[in-house]
C-alpha cells in the first residue's frame, strides 16, 4: 500500500486524521487539530481532544486527511 497524505501545512487549524509508522516500526493513529508544521523536520503537530500534542513524522505517514 502506498502512502497517501492529503494534509498540507495550509490545513493549520483544521481537524485532521493521520495513520503513521513510528521510528520503532509500530503503527499509530491520531485525530485532532493541526496546530503546526515544522518544514525542516517534516513533522506535523496535532492537538488531540485530551489536549496532548502529538508529533507525526511526515516520512512515516501512511494516510492523512482533513476530517469534519
What do the PLM-derived regions correspond to, one by one?
Residues 1-68:
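Conserved RNA-binding domains used in RNP assembly and mRNA/RNA metabolism
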Amino acid at each position: 500500500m502506498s502512502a497517501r497524505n492529503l494534509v498540507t501545512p495550509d490545513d493549520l487549524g483544521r481537524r485532521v486524521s493521520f495513520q503513521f509508522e513510528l521510528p520503532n516500526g509500530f503503527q499509530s493513529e491520531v485525530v485532532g487539530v493541526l496546530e503546526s508544521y515544522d518544514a525542516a523536520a517534516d513533522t506535523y503537530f496535532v492537538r488531540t481532544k485530551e489536549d496532548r500534542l502529538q508529533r507525526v513524522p511526515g516520512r512515516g505517514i501512511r494516510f492523512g486527511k482533513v476530517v469534519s
